[in-house]
Structures are given as C-alpha cells and as structure tokens.
Amino acid sequence: MRASLDDLRAKILEVSDFPEAGLSFQDLSLLLADRECFRTAVDLLAEWARAKKPEIVLGAEAGGFILGGALAHVLGTGFVAARRPDLPSSEVFRGDWEDEGGAGPLELSAGLIPEGSRVLVHDDLLATGATAQAKAESVERLGGEVVGIVFVVELQLLNGRRRLADRDVHSLIKL
C-alpha cells in the first residue's frame, strides 16, 4: 500500500534551534525507517524525474546519498556522490556553497560526469537553495546538463526556489 503525502509529512521530525538558534532541522530518519514512506518518497520522486530522462542522479552528502541512490536504482541510472572534502578520492572538482546553516565545499570525483550527460540533482531538503545551486553549477562546469532538481522537503519560508528560478525544481512536501 502506498503512503500518502500526509503520512510522509507526519514522519518528518522538526528539531528546533539546530544548527543554530532560530533555525530548525528537518530530520527524515523516521520517514526513511518506514518502508512504505521510504518507498513512496522514492516512487514519487521517480515519477516526476522519469520524464526528464536522466542518465545520472547526483546526491550530496549526507541526505542526498540515501534517497539519491534509491532514486538512481528505480530510474536505472548511475549515481554520483557530491562529497565533503578530505575523503580519499581520485582527482576532484570542487564547488563551494553557503547558506543559513554554514558554508563549505562539495567535491565531485573527476570523470564521473561525462560531457553532455543528463544529470538529475537530488537532496533531501531545499532551504536557501545554496547547496543545490552549487551542485548544479558544478555539474555544468564539468560538461553535464542539469535536467532537474528534486527534493523531499522544501522549507518555503527560506525561499530557496528564488535562487533556483532558472531551474526545473520539484519537491514532494512543502513546509
């Protein structure tokens, strides 16, 4: 049986004043632990993304790895991890981001995004749009084409869509 969007929303735990006072962290752990909610989230993201005909799903550490890998499996694509720096890797391409929760670099291993490949960018949460924009720009600098950006949760108050206005963006749950 497929879970509803209300079921998914009910599995998102809000942690107040994290990572700093006045901000809230949206914890998807309960959603991921519930097999029907997990399956529904992946299926709904895939339904939207399938028409984009991606060849690669790119997910950022850490939230984008879990659902991004499952999404790539359902879509029959490869999966590329945008990782935090200083992990063992081959030659890397580095992109930087900054948002309300901090700033930092993201790294992509060179050669994982072939020139002209169609890339779907995924993360668990859209806040300011800074990390999604950094990922999309990194893909494009490497010669890939960003065909869409998908999120499980969108925090509307932070208006991340404004930063991504020129992109095809989809989120399952708007808070």
Predicted features along the sequence, with ranges:
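PRPP-associated nucleotide enzymes
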Residues: 1-175
